[in-house]
UniProtKB/Swiss-Prot annotation:
It comes from Austrelaps superbus. The keyword Calcium applies. Binds 1 Ca(2+) ion. Disulfide bonds join 38-98, 54-143, 56-72, 71-126, 78-119, 87-112, 105-117. This is Acidic phospholipase A2 S12-65J. Snake venom phospholipase A2 (PLA2) that inhibits collagen-induced platelet aggregation. PLA2 catalyzes the calcium-dependent hydrolysis of the 2-acyl groups in 3-sn-phosphoglycerides.
Amino acid sequence: MYPAHLLVLLAVCVSLLGAASIPPQPLNLVQFSYLIQCANHGSRATWHYTDYGCYCGSGGSGTPVDELDRCCQTHDNCYGEAEKKGCYPKMLAYDYYCGGDGPYCRDIKKECQRFVCDCDVEAAKCFAKAPYDKENYNIKTRCQ
């Protein structure tokens, strides 16, 4: 083998090792972010919802601070119901589309996929309707 071939092979192996250390993004959460963008017509970036109030983002406790935070609490509860049904809501892929008046679930036959898609579509539509108060971003320390 030529030295140049060895260098290319080594570079590929190092790249693969680096990529293997990147944790995979749950597919459903990626789809959920697309649904949010569809519902709000791109008016607010998805990351604005990742650490909002007491329930938007990872975990949730205390009393929701406003309507948007209640949307997140309802979404968390919906995922909890999905888990009780034996579904894995953060990992399930489903079929949806973005119409002029917002996101919709396509004709989904599998119960778990349909349930989770409905959770996400309803939350995305709720986010789009609720006012966003930037004072409620990054306040988890106030949530009990």
